[in-house]
Every structure is written in structure tokens, then in C-alpha cells.
């Protein structure tokens, strides 16, 4: 028996809701959607097709597991499909966000990984005109 119909939401924890809002709304351009009046702070974003991202305050958070200087695809993350990965990568570069930007050999898709202020990883994935690895730009500490 299949226990579910579809993915409903992805939830991540942050230590500062205002910084998360600045990143997800201001930098990435996510659209905030109504959130029930829970007894803890947070933000909800609509991602399309009924999927949402739930940002939850956990100010006692030790640090997420992805707190590392480098950005690697095998670290925990969620991925968002983009119809034009080249335009998305250009926009991320213009914003000056540290990222890992590669073309996957097995799939031929371009993958651009960024981190939010709490170290949670977000991947943008989609088709590209390039067939080779594009570039890797990471934080100045690892450049």
C-alpha cells in the first residue's frame, strides 16, 4: 500500500526568522503564503504544485549538519526545478552568493547550490546549454 499521494512540504529550521525572510524573499524571490497562528515564529513559502517550504524558528539550534565551509551535492538539501538553469546561475552570480555550480555528468542538468544564513542548502536544477562543468564559486574562505 502506498502511504502517500505526493510531497506536501519541506521544513527547515533557522535561528533568525528575519534573516531567513531576507534571504528567501529578498534574495531568492520566494513568495510568502499564509501561515497558521502557531505558538512559534516561522514563514511559509509556496513553491508551486501544492508544495511549500516551512521555515521554523529554533533559536536553540546547535547548528545544522550542513555547516561546512564547502558546498557539496551530497549534503542534505532540497532542490527546486528551473526551466533555465543558465539564467538562474547568472542571477545568483549577480547577487554575489557563494555557490557550487556544476553540470551533472550522469544527467546533463546544471545544479547550482547555495546556502541560507543558517547553512541550509538549496539547489536549483534544470537544463543548460553547456555540456561541461561550468564553474565552482564558493565562499572566500575556501576559494
What are these model-predicted stretches?
Residues 1-19, 75-80, 128-143:
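N-terminal beta-strand motif that seeds the catalytic metal site of vicinal oxygen chelate
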Residues 2-3, 6-15, 43-47, 66-143, ...:
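Vicinal oxygen chelate
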Residues 13-52:
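Core segments of cupin and vicinal oxygen chelate
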Residues 40, 61-66, 132-134:
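A short, acidic/glycine-rich surface segment
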Residues 49-53, 59-62, 84-87:
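Short, charged/polar surface micro-motifs in flexible loops or helix N-caps
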Amino acid at each position: 500500500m502506498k502511504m502517500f499521494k505526493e510531497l506536501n512540504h519541506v521544513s527547515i529550521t533557522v535561528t533568525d526568522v528575519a534573516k531567513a525572510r531576507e534571504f528567501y524573499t529578498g534574495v531568492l524571490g520566494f513568495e510568502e503564503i499564509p501561515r497558521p497562528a502557531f505558538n512559534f515564529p516561522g514563514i511559509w513559502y509556496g513553491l508551486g504544485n501544492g508544495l511549500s517550504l516551512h521555515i521554523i524558528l529554533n533559536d536553540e539550534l546547535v547548528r545544522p549538519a550542513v555547516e561546512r565551509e564547502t558546498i557539496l551535492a551530497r549534503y542534505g538539501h532540497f532542490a527546486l526545478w528551473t526551466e533555465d538553469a543558465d539564467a538562474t546561475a547568472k542571477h545568483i552570480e549577480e547577487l554575489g552568493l557563494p555557490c557550487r555550480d556544476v553540470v551533472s555528468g550522469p544527467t546533463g542538468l546544471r545544479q547550482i547550490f547555495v546556502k541560507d544564513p543558517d547553512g541550509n542548502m538549496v539547489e536549483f536544477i534544470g537544463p543548460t546549454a553547456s555540456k561541461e562543468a561550468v564553474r565552482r564559486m564558493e565562499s572566500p574562505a575556501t576559494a
